[in-house]
């Protein structure tokens, strides 16, 4: 078959692996400049590939992006470089693994002032598993605080390369970019020439376009895809016509043919991003491939939280906003739920804490919806006395303790990288959070990698913030899910004057329930306003109350108008006031202010 377009041997597909803030998006800007994909004066925005406001502000990449560049090498040949930009954060590790599967090589970018971090190592292992050629790059060498040789030693210990294979660049100042471009062309292998095989294309990302429907970013692994071909998606068996195909250089460039080795996009009037799942394989209806590409899995949410509008008439607005967000984010799961305290809202499932924060922030920023979030929970498995297993992600669904045989909770294996002087602090945090310490490896004289196993429920809360504060910002963490284990968990209810408040209940470990209950009651005492009658705040497990605080009643002085006079007259007035308060207490409902629900989220402060 005659080659059309670029020869497969002239294509290089690569990605950049880096920790948050190590300069990945800035380096991508320099590569775009060096290949004249963008002139410097067009760089109105730094970090061209991070096109969401939130991505720029937090300095993170949330979605995968792809861009094609043409590079004229020193040997006079023209190469097509496809840079696939990957998210760096632990919550998005499945998206990262799919982006890596679309590449043949990876640039491992490490900050010369910070050294190797936990998420870099996690993504590096994914890249090595995918069989990628790794080019180590030390960035920010022009900063006065950089320690190039120290960082180079860490990289050599980590992946066993020679010192002369490690490149030194400064993305901001544009130092060393020429050598980097040559290394990409020389060291990263070309894709395999599988044009004669049946079509198999890997979807490594999908975005939603209001006019065109879902746009799938694809890497053609085998075969050839032509415009107007009829294609089938493996995950759901649905068939579509390829209305438009093409390559991505900052804007979409329509083409008539995409061949094995190419990276591009596919538009075929798909209404829902959930039909173009990340990791799925696309093949032709006429001459289909017999099996899909390896590595596809359905992403399961790990963290659950209730989202409620602050104004109850904003419910429809919240529903529409979630629908729009989920068009672009196939990993967001939500179902409507009601709460006696908060009214109508949604139970949402997220990949992890960062994902949850991003969704909340995007709802407030892009859609203008003010929301209250309930305590984040994980999914527990409850084995009933009858033998059946129930999955519970909301404390209010927890069955009565008499019917429960045992409860299992998800565990994660965590790697924490930090300076050696903070080991003691981190060990203490690990023990406080029911962590199981495994081992410590020294990366060099001053940095260590510590391994723990934690219940996910202890990590989703505020673990990352605590870790940063006890290590003065130096520690970084990465975790992966390892399965369910049996635990002694109880449901802790909060009662106001004997009435349970569903939005304040939580599932905690029995050993921590007393302390948690005490803290929660005293925190609520400071937040719930005083009433005309006494309010009892109780924390209870089942029918047993384990902690109590009392908000005393506001009292009017009924004796103020009695000057002297008979004691029985005074007693009568006081008794009458008591009666009134008793009646008030029976009919009165304690209004729980919104701060009370937020108080549960930061109970240690």
From Swiss-Prot:
HAMAP family: LepA. GO terms for molecular function: GTP binding; GTPase activity; ribosome binding; translation elongation factor activity. The lineage of its organism: Bacteria, Pseudomonadati, Chlorobiota, Chlorobiia, Chlorobiales. Belongs to the TRAFAC class translation factor GTPase superfamily. Classic translation factor GTPase family. LepA subfamily. One of its GO terms (cellular component) is plasma membrane. Transmembrane segments: none annotated. Required for accurate and efficient protein synthesis under certain stress conditions. May act as a fidelity factor of the translation reaction, by catalyzing a one-codon backward translocation of tRNAs on improperly translocated ribosomes. Back-translocation proceeds from a post-translocation (POST) complex to a pre-translocation (PRE) complex, thus giving elongation factor G a second chance to translocate the tRNAs correctly. Binds to ribosomes in a GTP-dependent manner. It comes from the Bacteria. It is an enzyme of class 3 (hydrolase). It is a peripheral membrane protein. PROSITE patterns: G_TR_2. It catalyses: GTP + H2O = GDP + phosphate + H(+). GO terms for biological process: positive regulation of translation. Keywords: Cell inner membrane, Cell membrane, GTP-binding, Hydrolase, Membrane, Nucleotide-binding, Protein biosynthesis. Its EC number is 3.6.5.n1. Residues 9-192 form the tr-type G domain. It is found in: Cell inner membrane. This is Elongation factor 4. GTP binds at residues 21-26, 139-142. Its main location: membrane.
